[in-house]
Amino acid sequence: MTDLVPVYYAFAGVVAALLFYKWQSDPLRAIPTIGPSAPLLSYLGAIRFFKDASGVLQEGYDKYNVFKVAMIDRWAVVVSGAKMNEELRSIPDDQMSFMDAADELVQTKYTIAPDVLIHPIHITVIKEQLTRNLAPLFHEVVKEVEAAMQELIPAKGDDWIEIDGYSTVTQIITRASSRVFVGFPLCQNAEYLRIATTYSAEVMKGAMIMSVLPDFLKHIVGPLLPWSRRALRRAAPFLLPIITERRRLLKEYGRDWEDKPNDLLMWIIEEARRVGREDSTDLMVQGIMASNFTAIHTSSLTFTHALYHLAANPEYIQSLREEIEEVIRTDGWTKVSMGSMWKLDSFLKESHRVNGISGISVMRLALKDVTFSDGTFIPAGTFVAAAATSTHHDEENYSDATVFKPFRFSDMRASESEKNKHHYVSTSAEYIGFGHGKHACPGRFFAANELKIMLASIVLNYDVKFEDEGKRPANVWFATTVLPAPGAKVMFRKRQT
């Protein structure tokens, strides 16, 4: 056995030499690193990033225009500041791809059904039909939000009740979104709603597992992940009978018939027909569930952040009420009139700015070698993103940048030259909560509409506070995801004034 000791040492030396050579020749080595960058030691940096992404990103933002951080399965390059954000988003798609970056981050080929990745018909529908139909569907969303709140926030008289903030918000958003996605009465079916709600968590569970595996194991473990496939199987019995009947009516009557449904599922069926996939009912089910994934998870986090601000600062409720009631009294309660509720819009935009739901945005995957204007070389295959939270907390972009000022953006719009700017859904190099440019979140118009209806409904019907008045529970970072404090309780009572 002792005769083999020199062999072991020689083998270890060869491995060390190979790792050192790979490190020395890595084109990313020239980019400053937050944390250790040497072979093996970089995994310590990845662990730190997982535990303290906020601190790591802020350190890099304060020091460098471009820096890199270690993730378990890759290096991520991060750009700092509005100028670099603008440069990143303007790089052509054939050089840096948003879709490929999203696929990498969520590991979609293992966590999302493959058919809808090849034929993402739901994205076309969300960009076009859903956005065009926000006004006709406005009162459907209002009715579902009001019904859900009466059931889930059953405050009576002058008694305060306590509810779990995030859980309740998620249930309301799932019902309101489902009203638009699949229509009534399925939007109120408890078992279907449970499947729709848990699908997002199951996709993210799979993505987290895949993100810590080396590439050679991903091909083995990925096909074995059960959760999202199981959710699709469970959703199918609810959706397939509706799809079958609507396809029959479409075949019999053509594009129009009396009482034709006006919802996402109908548009997905028609889009599948348009692209020659009219017989692929599995694709239609996958399209609905993929839409649930993008809508429910992100909107629930976003609105819970805003609800926590409202509960911590109930003194702002009266100003919001006065604006909402004045607009309704003058113009009615419609999608168009809601555009006049500047303070409502500003409250949500400011909450999104201060908190966000991710520390990074404007994600891209380099398809070719790219060189930034400052000379930084990005080799093909590199994951690149902008530092979202740090951008939003930058004093060069916003005064008192870390302070929540609910009417910051409505005050900015008071100037004649600014009144058509600073909408919640607007993006810029300084405001990247929805991404920026042509790849900004296509569902943000629907999401903003839904969240404004929810916030207005709460303000008009309830008083809100935390038991520990005036104190907002701290956010929790899970890698780059920014979570509103899990399990935090919010106090509600019927409006008293």
UniProtKB/Swiss-Prot annotation:
Please give the cofactor(s) recorded in the UniProt entry for this protein: heme
The processes (GO biological process) annotated in the record are: secondary metabolic process
Q: Where in the cell is it found?
A: Membrane
EC number, as in UniProt: 1.-.-.-
Q: Identify the metabolic or biological route this protein is part of.
A: Secondary metabolite biosynthesis
| TM ranges | 1-21
Q: What class of enzyme is it?
A: oxidoreductase
Q: Is Nucleotidyltransferase among the key words of this record?
A: no
InterPro entries for the chain? Cyt_P450 (IPR001128), Cyt_P450_CS (IPR017972), Cyt_P450_E_grp-I (IPR002401), Cyt_P450_sf (IPR036396)
Entry membrane topology: Single-pass membrane protein
Primary localisation category:
membrane
* Disulfide cysteine pairs (residue numbers): none
Q: Which residues are glycosylated?
A: N292, N397
The record lists heme as bound by: C441
Gene Ontology molecular function: heme binding; iron ion binding; monooxygenase activity; oxidoreductase activity, acting on paired donors, with incorporation or reduction of molecular oxygen
Query: Which stretch is the leader sequence?
Result: none
Alphabetically list the UniProt keywords.
Answer: Glycoprotein, Heme, Iron, Membrane, Metal-binding, Monooxygenase, Oxidoreductase, Transmembrane, Transmembrane helix
What GO cellular component term, any one, is given? membrane
Q: Which Pfam families match?
A: p450
Q: What does this protein do?
A: Cytochrome P450 monooxygenase that is able to use dehydroabietic acid and testosterone as substrates for oxidation, suggesting that the natural substrate(s) may be structurally related to steroid compounds.
> PANTHER family given for it?
CYTOCHROME P450
Q: Which family does it belong to?
A: Belongs to the cytochrome P450 family.
Please identify the protein, giving its name as recorded: Cytochrome P450 monooxygenase 151
Q: Give the source species.
A: Postia placenta (strain ATCC 44394 / Madison 698-R)
